[in-house]
Amino acid sequence: MNIKKIAIPVVLSVVALGLGFWVAGKLFDPGTGSRDQQVTPEGLQGYMLSPARKIAVPTLVKGNGSSFTGNDVKGHWTAMFFGYTNCPDICPTTMAVLVQAKKQAATQGVEFPEVVFVSVDPERDKVEMLGEYVGYFDKDFTGVTGDSKLIDALARQMSVVYMRVPSVTDDPDNYQVDHSAGILLLNPEGKLTAFLTAPHTPTGIVDSIQAIINHTPPA
C-alpha cells in the first residue's frame, strides 16, 4: 500500500463536517440514559467525565489477525480514534499528529497511551489492509475492525457519530464516511474518561493527557 507522507500543520483545523461527540453540555451515557457530568482541568483541550463511563468492549479483530477484547484497554491508558483507511484527510492527519505527540511525550517524560484506531468502514477495511495502514504510522499502534454491528455498538457507547456518504460516481464502492474527529481517552480500568476535541496538535494532545492523568485519582 502506498500512503503519501503527511505533513503535520501547526494547527489541524479540521472537524468531521460538524460531527462531534456531543452538543455542549448534553453528553449522555447511552447505557443509563443519564447526562454525564463534565469537568475541564487546566490544560485539557476537551472534557473529562466524572465519573468515568463503563464500556463493554466487544470482541473485534486486530490488524495482525488476533482478537481485540476489553482486556486490551486495561492496565494502561488508551487513546482511541474512529476512522477508516480510505479517509482522505482527517484520519491520516490525526494519526500523524498522534505519532508526533508520542515522540513529544517521550521527551517530556509524559506517559503516552496506547493508540487504537477503530475502523468505521469494516466492509472495505480488511484485517491485513488495516494492519498495514496503521503500522505505516507506528508499529505499536493497533488497528481494529470486525462485524459492523459490534463496531456500531462500541461507537454508541462512546458517543461517537459516523455515517456513510453515498458515492457520487458510478462506482458504489467509492463512498466516504463522515465521522467524529475527536480522540477518546480510556483509563487503565478500561473506562471512558475524556474526549480530546479537534483541532489536534502534538502539544495539545500531550498537555491534555498530562492534565487528565494529574486529575485522575490513583487506583
Residue ranges and their predicted role:
Residues 68-94, 98:
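Short active-site neighborhood of thiol/selenol oxidoreductases, capturing the structured segment around
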Residues 55-56, 78, 180-181:
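Short loop/turn microsegments at loop-to-beta-strand junctions
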Residues 1-56:
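N-terminal targeting signals for export/organelle localization
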Residues 93-154:
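Structural microenvironment flanking redox-active thiols in thiol-disulfide oxidoreductases
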Residues 63-64, 188:
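Short, ordered coil/turn segments that flank beta-strands lining enzyme active or ligand-binding pockets
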Residues 59-60, 185:
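Hydrophobic beta-strand positions
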Residues 150-208:
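Thiol/disulfide oxidoreductase modules built on the thioredoxin-like
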Residues 33-38, 142-152, 179-183:
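Periplasmic c-type cytochrome electron-transfer domains
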